[in-house]
């Protein structure tokens, strides 16, 4: 009797503990199921899979690509009218290849687009005709296209909105909706002026070089390095219209190219602090008196035609901005809102199309995008894989623009002449440089090889007809400016290959 009572108490206590444990665990599981982690998006009926802010080249192309993969895409664009821009008017051969991989090659048709087979380069009375190479390794027609940017953008918008899972809406995005470091959607004002919200597991900021949302995602700032001043000369056609005319003028380059069967774009670079006023007519006088005399005689009439006929002259800032990865989840930045380089080689659209192809392929294995952690891993991979294309184009664009700047410095002017000589020399040097400029061979090592070649050609200018102390000094300065240790040392070369060449380019 005395032993029975303690046994009963022990068994009763054990039963109570087991019952309480089971009850607690079950309740805990229910709470976890009801209260998901902040990184997991709670889907609402009718929500899109992806919100894209901006329906320019990048936003429209991305919307089409993701919708073809079965994603529901909500695109919010500030102004659905046809854009009027003087940038984004040339698609390199490499860009056309990427456009075709996205199934959008027909958007460059039926807009009075002009075939471009290469460049006509002018310097101090010299002229060189250089073409994009017929390269068996490049699986597409080796020609570019010049066009009105607005016509191209409208075709892309039409193509994207033709898919049933794309909602293309006019509205102004005011801010991103953020919870615990995860972007959940956007607040925007629709075309009726009503402020509303939209939610999606992934938000893509693709609102261009004047992005208002970029600072909400990262602290990247764009640097204004110069201004592109341009206008259109109408009802005229260039001699040999399939060649873009690149003039090594002062203070920097001038370009003329056919953007329709009847219209020619004239554009030149001017640096801050020396920009005449457009509104009071000073710019028109500057173009006629200072720039026109530097334009070759066979092009000068067309250059002056637009000015004499009162064409609208525009000035647009040239910006440079390195790409940085945001620490916030549920969001990615693309296009000029993400990364900008000098437009001298007209490759901005090519870079964003490459980025879209990479991002699309990385997202394809994810059945849904609700897990912000998984999407963040995709974005990190995207940032690495894009390097072969973006690093090559960014470096080339910025380096080429520096070479085109006129200077009284003997070393810099030798580099300018060396670039002209290298481009016009023919053979593998010309074909290699044109393949790089055309996005047909976006390999960093090839870029290093040809930049070294231009540098050596420039040094030859300085040391000709025989070495002098001053020439040798300028040569050493030139090598130092180009970073000889980074280019030639085995350690730097190995690090470069590891960083850029191990990733698979699309």
Swiss-Prot record:
This is Squalene monooxygenase 1,1. Pathway: Terpene metabolism; lanosterol biosynthesis; lanosterol from farnesyl diphosphate: step 2/3. One of its GO terms (cellular component) is membrane. It is an enzyme of class 1 (oxidoreductase). It is found in: Membrane. Keywords: FAD, Flavoprotein, Membrane, Oxidoreductase, Transmembrane, Transmembrane helix. Its cofactor is FAD. The keyword Signal does not apply. GO terms for biological process: sterol biosynthetic process. Belongs to the squalene monooxygenase family. It is a multi-pass membrane protein. It catalyses: squalene + reduced [NADPH--hemoprotein reductase] + O2 = (S)-2,3-epoxysqualene + oxidized [NADPH--hemoprotein reductase] + H2O + H(+). Its main location: membrane. Catalyzes the stereospecific oxidation of squalene to (S)-2,3-epoxysqualene, and is considered to be a rate-limiting enzyme in steroid biosynthesis. FAD binds at residues 57-58, 77-78, 85, 90, 157, 173, 336, 349.
């Amino acid at each position: 009797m005395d032993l029975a009572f303690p046994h009963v108490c022990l068994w009763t206590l054990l039963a109570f503990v087991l019952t309480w444990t089971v009850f607690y665990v079950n309740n805990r599981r229910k709470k976890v199921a009801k209260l998901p982690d902040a990184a997991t998006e709670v889907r609402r009926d009718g929500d899109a899979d992806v919100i894209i802010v901006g329906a320019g080249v990048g936003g429209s192309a991305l919307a089409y690509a993701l919708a073809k993969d079965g994603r529901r895409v909500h695109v919010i664009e500030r102004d659905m009218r046809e854009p009027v821009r003087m940038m984004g008017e040339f698609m390199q051969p490499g860009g056309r290849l990427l456009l075709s991989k996205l199934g959008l090659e027909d958007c460059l048709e039926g807009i009075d687009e002009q075939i471009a087979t290469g460049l006509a380069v002018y310097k101090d009375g010299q002229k060189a005709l250089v073409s994009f190479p017929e390269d068996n390794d490049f699986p597409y027609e080796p020609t570019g296209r010049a066009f009105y940017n607005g016509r191209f953008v409208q075709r892309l918008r039409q193509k994207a909105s033709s898919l049933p899972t794309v909602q293309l809406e006019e509205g102004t995005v005011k801010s991103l909706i953020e919870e615990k470091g995860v972007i959940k959607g956007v607040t925007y004002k629709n075309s009726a002026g009503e402020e509303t919200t939209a939610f999606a597991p992934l938000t893509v900021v693709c609102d261009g070089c004047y992005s208002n949302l970029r600072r909400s995602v990262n602290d990247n700032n764009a640097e204004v390095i110069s201004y592109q001043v341009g206008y259109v000369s109408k009802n005229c056609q260039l001699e040999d219209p399939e060649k873009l005319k690149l003039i090594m003028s002062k203070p920097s380059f001038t370009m003329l190219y056919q953007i329709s069967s009847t219209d020619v774009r004239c554009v030149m670079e001017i640096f801050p602090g020396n920009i005449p006023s457009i509104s009071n007519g000073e710019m028109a006088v500057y173009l006629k008196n200072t720039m026109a005399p530097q334009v070759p005689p066979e092009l000068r009439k067309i250059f002056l035609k637009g000015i004499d006929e009162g064409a609208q002259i525009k000035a647009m800032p040239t910006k440079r901005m390195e790409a940085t990865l945001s620490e916030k989840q549920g969001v990615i930045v693309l296009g000029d809102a993400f990364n900008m380089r000098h437009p001298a080689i007209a490759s901005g659209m090519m870079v964003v199309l490459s980025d879209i192809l990479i991002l699309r392929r990385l997202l394809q294995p994810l059945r849904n995008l609700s897990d912000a952690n998984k999407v963040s891993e995709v974005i990190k991979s995207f940032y690495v894989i894009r390097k072969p294309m973006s690093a090559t184009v960014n470096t080339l664009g910025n380096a080429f623009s520096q070479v085109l700047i006129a200077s009284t410095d003997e070393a810099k002017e030798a580099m300018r002449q060396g670039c002209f000589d290298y481009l016009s020399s023919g053979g593998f040097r010309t074909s290699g440089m044109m393949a790089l400029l055309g996005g047909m061979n976006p390999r960093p090592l090839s870029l290093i090889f040809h930049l070294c070649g231009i540098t050596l050609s420039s040094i030859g200018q300085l040391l000709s007809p025989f070495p002098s102390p001053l020439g040798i000094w300028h040569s050493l300065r030139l090598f130092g400016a180009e970073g000889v240790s980074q280019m030639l040392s085995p350690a730097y070369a190995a690090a470069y290959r590891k960083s850029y060449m191990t990733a698979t380019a699309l």
